[in-house]
């Protein structure tokens, strides 16, 4: 009954919505006129848009502050969420790692212990909650080198898709200094302990929030060198233009597998022989009619999973 009464009270809260002014913008598509009265909001860097966002936020939080059961709801959610959460362990070199959240931490913390020792001896390896006091820097992806002695991890500042990649010596936990910037929609895949492959777009001119980015590229970064010297591996030509490209090195360091797509479904597959880097990249699959990925390699044979002509994916 109390919840119903509180819900009724929240519905009684009056909201004075701010007015969003309209402009006379009209585009014509195939002979049809389409009005776009809020085109001005597409300029996310303008003073007008900034003022509009501030006004909208003020309206929202003014309303939320008056919801009678807000604190009660917050306390209930905190109680439900406040329990220890531990991820599956994984082994790298001499250590076993796992992700853990004590209950209400904003981000999971990476712990580790010497493999073979009691897991209760685990200590903090990397705590994203300490990246910045206000919590606006988060941990993205992580990738250990083949030996397990090096780590590349990405961070996001303020929720941006444009990330930095940081490299670390996992034995000493010291940052190596090979920090890459302006990396977007990328994993990291190590080649031996010498460097790693990653993907990104050219940094757009103007706003990074609204500018178009549609040509993903794969680069190789060699440790100890400048990002300016990174080698463009794939995606630099019009024929190689794709919206999303990912690359990973096989476990034996012999091949680089490249997956390229123009949307969020369907991908092409390519392979590069890392033992003969001068050789051209070979096409495995030249269409995007299916989702096809390499799942294993034994000797010279690749095993793929695909949904091509297979509603339930098959291994080929």
Report residues per predicted region.
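Beta-propeller folds
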Residues: 3-316
